Amino acid sequence: MLFRSAVNTFSSAIELNPSNPFLYLNRSTTRAEMIDFISSIDNSYQRITIDSDPANRLNNNSKRTYSYDEAVADLNKAVKLFPDFAYAYYNRANLLALSGSLPEAFEDYTKAISLNPAFAEAYYNRGIIQLFMKDTRKGCLDLSKAGELGITEAYEVLKRYASLDN
């Protein structure tokens, strides 16, 4: 209920000031957090079935899918209004990655890094994306850079990843 109220408040503010990119950014964040909250409740609830056929149980227990489309649309607007704001690209990349659009997420992380070369979180996330996209060398380079910029967890990921290769 509070999420919906916050989204409505941001929507009203956008009607009054449609050229403020931060209103779109905040509405996007609120929408994404609302989806994550609802999803976490859904995913923690175990549905019990008496069906003995595993395929039917799998179909009956399949998770709902949630769309970040509205949140991404808000970030598209924020980027259009404030094209030099690295966090808008970063946030959009996060939502694109969660939606499975890895190449598009990679592009947005790259843009965020070009706007803010010390953006450690963007290097970290882009590195993870590159590992998923099977570009191990570049992924490891980005994770290393994230570590240099202060995300020590990046070194742990590199160690675990290296141990998988051996």
Model-based region annotation:
Residues 1-166:
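Alpha-helical tetratricopeptide repeat
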